[in-house]
């Protein structure tokens, strides 16, 4: 009897203790929450050294081959010049663009061209391996866009827009170039700029990947010339013009 009574008293005491703890928890529910959950979420399981904490550059740059094996088209996934183009055939011409200057500092880069949403880089010769050049080009482009610097510091016209002084034939040539021909050439990483129209001959300047492309003459004759002659009977032919002596030497070299 005594043992049974003691067991009953013990059970009652335990039950009373549980009731007090339960009531205390109901009155103070936060006593069981020793640390907010978000502190566990934000706390790294394996703390890294301070040297590893740095801004991460989120940029995926695609590359696209061009008809010119020495030119490669880099697509950063964001606008470059949007609706126009700029050509930098030599390092001296790159004074207008901080990015072009940085790209020319990479050994083996011959010329740089900016399109609406791409950057065309041309290497000096076929012996240079793109696999050796591309890492430096990727890093230069990513660093520049992360810096927030302006792409160009001096505005220059990229082509010859139509004006009121143009006659009907010249206006038609420029419109056809802008709407049908230039977009196609830009897809290959280059551009074509109107320079003049005289005695039935349309004078054009090729830029970007088209400058030193082995098939540039074919592009002029079979592509651009045929289209211009089809729509504009006054056009008798197309010829490529050079802006400086270096271009002329390159065109005349074997």
From Swiss-Prot:
Tissue: Ubiquitous. Expression in adult lung is weak compared to fetal lung.
Main location: mitochondrion
Listed InterPro entries: FSCA_dom_sf, Nfu/NifU_N, Nfu/NifU_N_sf, NIF_FeS_clus_asmbl_NifU_C
GO annotations of cellular component type: cytosol; mitochondrial matrix; mitochondrion; nucleoplasm; nucleus
Organism: Homo sapiens (Human)
Designated name of the protein: NFU1 iron-sulfur cluster scaffold homolog, mitochondrial
Localization per Swiss-Prot or TrEMBL: Mitochondrion; Cytoplasm, Cytosol
GO molecular function, one term: 4 iron, 4 sulfur cluster binding
Recorded name of the encoding gene: NFU1
Keywords: Cytoplasm, Disease variant, Hereditary spastic paraplegia, Iron, Iron-sulfur, Metal-binding, Mitochondrion, Neurodegeneration, Primary mitochondrial disease, Transit peptide
Stretch list, region NifU: 173-241
Native organism taxonomy: Eukaryota, Metazoa, Chordata, Craniata, Vertebrata
Annotated binding of [4Fe-4S] cluster, by residue: 210, 213
